Structure formats: C-alpha cells, structure tokens
Amino acid sequence: MLLKRLSGLGYEWRVGNKTGKKLMTTRFELRTRYIQGWYELDADKLISSTSHDFMFDDPAEPEPVNRASLPEYMIRWDKRTRLLGATNVWDLSDEVCQDRDGILTDWEWWELVGTDLCGMAIVKTRDDGVFFERITYFD
C-alpha cells in the first residue's frame, strides 16, 4: 500500500515497512508556494505559482477570478474576511491529495480562525502552475 503526504520538503511514501523521501516535483513546489501566498497575502507568490489559464471560482464573486484579477480578489477577500473578525489565520484539515497523470489535486476543509467562515476547497496544479481552485462555504 502506497501512502503519500505533502510536506514542506517533499512527500513521504511508505510501502510495507519501508519509508523514504522523494524530491518534490514542480507541481508540489508550485502548490506549496500558492498556499504560502494565501497565508502571507502575497500577490507575487500567488501570481508566480499560477498557470496562464488559472481560474478561481468563489460563489461570493459575480464571475470567476483569473490570473490577472487574482491580486484584486485577494484584497477583496482580505477586506471581506476582516469585517467578519478574521486575521488571516487558517485551519486546514481533512486534506486529501492525489497526484495522477501530471495533475496534483488537493481537497481540504478550511476555516478562518476567529470567524464562522468555513468550507471546502479543491485546488488543481500542473507543472506550469495552479490552474484551478474552487471554494465553497458552509453554515
């Protein structure tokens, strides 16, 4: 049975009782940079980790966010969540990752600490960058 877990340096794998490390591929590095960009509210990190055909789907937005509009969306997101009491401290849990056919797909439950804001996210990354994210909100 093969188990994988994302980490800051690579992903771990285990087959039977043997454990090892494999260097991260570009898509793992880009996914890590993308989430760091959100944690740090760093537009440069976000843009540099996305592909040219990037699309972000947030049901609170009137239309999908593309790569060019991502920095403005990040500012709107920060203002909107701070009005709810958030300080951009995230709690991600129940993460599931799949690396298949050159696409890293990551699902997680997210919560903004200090608020009732929570939901699910799916993020898809290729070796040219994060190309898709969709978030949902739950009450």
Regions found by a protein language model. Give the residues of each.
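Short amphipathic alpha-helical segments enriched in hydrophobics
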Residues: W38, D42, F54, D78-T81
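Short, solvent-exposed secondary-structure junction/capping segments
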Residues: T32-Q36, S48-E63
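Short, aromatic-enriched amphipathic alpha-helices that serve as compact interaction elements
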Residues: L23-D42, S49, Y73
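A beta-strand edge to alpha-helix "cap/lid" segment located at domain peripheries
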Residues: L2-L6, Y11-K22, E61, P71-D139
